A protein has these predicted regions:
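Short, hydrophobic/aromatic-enriched beta-strand segments in well-ordered soluble domains
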Residues: 72-74, 91, 150-164, 213-221, ...
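Hydrophobic helix-coil surface modules that form long, contiguous segments used
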Residues: 190, 205-386, 415
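A surface-exposed beta-strand-loop module
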Residues: 26, 67, 77, 105-175, ...
Length: 626
């Protein structure tokens, strides 16, 4: 029996393997599967590896000069089977250098001198590093090669100025700073591309290894520091009452004003030494970020995110009490988001100890932090914050290569944003928001760049094509698959994918193969339709063929995407029937499908309702009876 089961399992997996090979696969990806680092059954292969760094950092922020400086020690492990002759060093904030390539024009306030490295050594040996000529990625040629399964210790001393104009990071106001991508890091070396040397140009986002961090932030008195990771020394840097409130907020759902506007003004929040050193630590995470201000107020509470263990996560907010009116409800919004994402979609307990919403300008996600704008519209503010918190799962929990595959990241955050929006504001409001911000612009623009295949490398796609491939089109594919499989099976398949790859570095083919395995069926026809074509959203009723008691409605798929739709039949007596079609209707014939409708009563009209899959030419979606 066991042997027969094993043979059946092999035949089943063989079916997945054969079907997966039907999808286009670049040569370097084929090589990874051939080497056994990835597997056609959706799981990491028997030879899978990823490199790792242990970062110990001491960082200082000078609020007067706006200079960030630091010392770091990196214990870097080469877990690959390759001998490394170079280190690729990534420093995203060199984007501010005048000589760095960027995806769009910037103002003078955006520009800075970039990174200065004053000391660089490997295993105690000093290196001369010309960081002034680096872009967002620099190269260090190793004096001694780094053998497989061996380690080196890299020590760096560095500094750089915070840009006056804040985007994803920089100065929010003269005394509030969001300090992201703040340290030189060893870039990713992976099994399918080797060193990641793609420059950051301010459009396509990031790709980082899972590392361990211990770090300190030295800040002037009265500046509160908010950061990724466990806050290790609140009693050393906060006054007793403030520290007590923070700890209390960790254990209850009631929003606590940890530090008020008046307390910040009166110097009653931080210890009154000239400088305070804030300590943080976190393991197995892709990045750490921090922010600080001497006048933002501070709120906090917590919520149970894992009902099996009763583990709680903290939700905090830091904002300007005068201008940040949206943020007065930020903790309440995040308590709801952490609970909803943990128990609904994706239905995996929020994996971190906290999330902090900091008032800034970027509307951007970071591990355990978001940097959001003040909108003046509480509904919109909540949806944006929901989107950024959803990024906890994609890219951070899942280790996504956002630079190459933004749709594996933004597409899921957009999907979860929509699903939580239904719970918060009702389906009609969520549909309207989704169509307005995620679909309308794309489908009403007939230009070529809108119809590039989703599988296109994100750093190679620009303009509207980048945004729509990454957000709306990718999200529509995930929601279409959910409609086709149904909630239960879709969640099973999604959890298979997330279980296979959380904490690692999946690529699109790992997603395809994992979903095939989790759903227990060959979905490659669907993935081919959505990811590897120039399809778009456009259905049409090509004809209605009457017959006794039944009529045949022939629906033509002009645009090509396998989308769900409703056939709405209006009868002469004013009553209506709605016949839902899942994307499975397109499996046998992706060009045209026949739908049978009841014609016992006289029909006034038949129409197609595509819902959020907004039709490019809605005028041909209606048939009027004679």
């Amino acid at each position: 029996m066991k042997k027969l089961f094993s043979i059946a399992l092999l035949l089943s997996l063989g079916g997945y393997m054969a079907s997966a090979q039907e999808l286009y696969m670049p040569r370097n990806i084929k090589a990874a599967y051939a080497k056994g680092t990835r597997s056609m059954n959706g799981k990491p292969g028997p030879n899978y590896w990823q490199n790792h760094g242990k970062y110990n950092m001491d960082i200082k922020v000078d609020a007067e000069t706006k200079v960030v400086s630091g010392k770091e020690e990196i214990l870097y492990s080469n877990n690959s089977s390759d001998t490394l002759k170079n280190l690729a060093i990534r420093f995203v904030n060199n984007l501010h250098k005048p000589t760095s390539p960027r995806s769009s024009a910037v103002s003078e306030d955006f520009l800075s001198t970039g990174l200065n490295i004053s000391s660089f050594s490997i295993d105690g040996e000093t290196y001369k590093v010309d960081s002034k000529n680096w872009g967002t990625v620099g190269n260090v040629k190793l004096k001694k090669t780094l053998a497989p399964k061996s380690k080196i210790t890299v020590k760096i001393e560095w500094d750089y100025p915070l840009s006056k104009e804040s985007g994803r990071e920089g100065q929010i106001d003269p005394n509030s700073f969001f300090v992201a991508y703040s340290y030189p890091r060893i870039s990713v070396y992976d099994d399918y591309n080797g060193w990641d040397r793609i420059p950051h140009t301010d459009r396509a986002e990031f790709y980082n290894d899972f590392n361990d961090y211990e770090f300190t932030i030295k800040a002037p008195k009265n500046y509160v520091v908010y950061a990724t990771g466990d806050f290790l020394n609140p009693d050393e840097v906060l006054q007793p009452e403030i520290s007590a409130r923070l700890k209390k907020s960790y254990n209850g759902n009631e929003v606590i004003h940890i530090a008020t506007e008046q307390e910040m003004k009166d110097g009653k929040v931080t210890k009154q030494k000239d400088w305070n050193t804030w300590k943080f630590a976190v393991n197995h995470i892709t990045d750490v970020t921090f922010a600080l201000s001497n006048h933002y107020v501070w709120d906090g509470a917590s919520v149970i995110v894992d009902k099996k263990t009763n583990r709680r996560s903290s939700a905090q907010a830091a904002y300007n009490p005068t201008t940040g009116k949206d943020f007065a409800n930020s903790v309440k919004y995040n308590l709801n988001a952490l609970d909803w994402f943990s128990n609904n979609w994706p239905g995996i307990p929020y994996p971190y100890v906290k999330t902090i919403a900091f008032q800034g300008f970027a509307d951007m996600e970071y591990p355990m932090m978001v940097n959001d704008s003040q909108f003046g519209d509480p509904v919109f503010a909540q949806l944006v914050q929901d989107h950024e918190v959803a990024h906890t799962y994609f890219p951070f929990y899942m280790g996504i290569n956002e630079t190459r595959y933004a749709y594996m990241d933004e597409g899921w955050a957009t999907t979860f944003e929509y699903l939580i929006g239904i719970a918060e504001h009702g389906k009609q409001a969520a549909d309207d928001f989704y169509k307005k911000f995620r679909v309308d612009q794309y489908i009403n623009d007939k230009s070529t760049e809108e119809d590039q295949p989703i599988i296109s490398m994100s750093d190679q796609v620009s303009g509207a094509g980048y945004g729509n491939n990454s957000y709306g089109k990718a999200s529509l594919s995930y929601l279409a698959l959910k409609d086709m499989l149904g909630n239960e099976l879709f969640k099973k398949a999604l959890h298979t994918y997330m279980s296979n790859w959380n904490g690692k570095h999946p690529i699109p083919w790992d997603y395809f193969n994992s979903m095939n395995a989790g759903a227990g069926q060959n979905l490659n026809w669907f993935f081919q339709n959505w990811f590897f074509t120039n399809n778009y959203l456009d259905l049409a009723i090509s004809r209605v063929t009457p017959a006794k008691g039944k009529s045949t409605v022939t629906v033509k798929n002009v645009g090509g995407f396998a989308i769900p739709f409703d056939v709405v039949v209006i009868y002469a007596d004013g009553k209506a029937d709605t016949i839902h079609q899942t994307p499975a209707v397109w499996k046998a014939n992706q060009k045209e499908v026949n739908i049978m409708v009841n014609t016992i009563k006289k029909i006034t009209s038949i129409s197609l309702d595509n819902g959020i899959y907004v039709d490019a030419t809605p005028k041909d979606n209606v048939w009027e009876g004679k």
